[in-house]
Amino acid sequence: MRRIPRIPSTASALCSSSSSVASTSAAPLRTLRAAADSSSICQSCSFSTQTSATRNRVWQNTVQTQRRCASTVTETTPEAPVAAAAAETATESTETVEQQRKRKGGFFETQRQVNLVLPGQPTRADAPEKIRDPNYEPATSGAGLQEIGGMSDWWSKPEHFRDGGKQFEYQGFAPQEKITDPRLLKVILRRALAEGLALKKFGANPKNPADMASIIGNGDHWQRTVSVEMCRGENGELSLKNESDLQKVWILMRNAAEKTYYQREWQEEINRLRSLGEKEQAKQLLEEGKKLGYRLKSEEGSLVKLTVDEAVELRKSWNNDWKEAIIRDPVVKFYAAKRIQKMTGHILSDGKLTSIQTVANFMDALVTPPKPKKLAEQIEQSSILPELPNVKVYPRRVTPVDKERMVGRWKVIQKELQKRELPVLGTGNHGKYVELKWLGSKQ
């Protein structure tokens, strides 16, 4: 058995610069800074998120309680993983923040508090020779003895989950309802490509571009992101006309990632305060977070805060040259696919991504509806047969019962069958004709 150390880590939103990082494992909110080298982004683009004094005061009052409620986890592991974990911990302690960011691909894993009530340490009963009760008779086997405690049904009891187990409920990456309007899909595609270009220029390791797509959160700032001018760059590849537009888009992405991270910690702290019975502090923190624009998960709704009229208005300033631009970079293509999946629910398979070469191909793969799975669906979508006066299309096979219902005889037939105690549908309790066996036919 070994005790896993709690390694302090910063937010998973974006990495911070090597100059200054304000982060501790105990502090519920951490100030994030720009994730870029000094050579790629100028000093004027660096920023930090300001928090109000009221929120800091509320959080500081709960830091000590959070430390008391922090739990440790024990597990049994072989010697090799233990040595690997120790080596990784030693490496992180000697590396700078910028070196850790590059080694981990540009992102930090978030250390989240698990709302579990862990079982206590096992206790042993006294030895038989130490018991002075003369009526005590030690058992020779476990048959018939009462079982006290144990781990057989520990995780089946709701009181062992401080939040009722909501933290462990499955949360899908993509929304359940897909966006099918082509006008919205084209605007979302343009935003995803602009963010992908900014991520390629200033962002993370090419191994995990989808991490950014999963933490950006709600799609705000549509006007500032979509209004950037796209064009065909060198060798016909897609690029932004102005270099400053890439920096603007990147800053918007970092701000959105920080907001998502702070909002998640804010909601976790509210749930923790409510579970401890500190309703006044939870209410104060809830009001302060709403002033900063934070929303609970139940209040977020759809990820895309964009209407059809707004999408049509945004498309008026676009040129048509960007549609013929080539997309060769796999980071841009893969990030755009994951970002679209996160916001619209459309999943672009690897085969489709491989065949996509230009923006127009990407748009066609996204806007074109999927092929119908049934022949009836294909006939319904076609406008030839349904428009004929003597043709009617049904979604399924027309049975004899359906034909009787069309002419109005089914109720009479059903009534007569019930009067004779015969099954209305199927054979009921009646077997097959015995005459078939006499005639030697197959049953």
Swiss-Prot record:
UniProt keyword Mitochondrion present: yes
Region annotation Disordered: where it falls in the sequence: 121-145
Listed InterPro entries: Ribosomal_m50
Keyword Ribonucleoprotein attributed: yes
Compartment list: Mitochondrion
Basic and acidic residues compositional bias, start-end: 126-135
Keyword terms: Mitochondrion, Ribonucleoprotein, Ribosomal protein
Main subcellular localisation: mitochondrion
Cellular component, GO annotation: mitochondrion; ribonucleoprotein complex; ribosome
Function: Component of the mitochondrial ribosome (mitoribosome), a dedicated translation machinery responsible for the synthesis of mitochondrial genome-encoded proteins, including at least some of the essential transmembrane subunits of the mitochondrial respiratory chain. The mitoribosomes are attached to the mitochondrial inner membrane and translation products are cotranslationally integrated into the membrane.
Subunit structure: Component of the mitochondrial large ribosomal subunit (mt-LSU). Mature N.crassa 74S mitochondrial ribosomes consist of a small (37S) and a large (54S) subunit. The 37S small subunit contains a 16S ribosomal RNA (16S mt-rRNA) and 32 different proteins. The 54S large subunit contains a 23S rRNA (23S mt-rRNA) and 42 different proteins.
Family: Belongs to the mitochondrion-specific ribosomal protein mL50 family.
Protein name: Large ribosomal subunit protein mL50
The organism of origin for this protein: Neurospora crassa (strain ATCC 24698 / 74-OR23-1A / CBS 708.71 / DSM 1257 / FGSC 987)
Gene: mrpl13
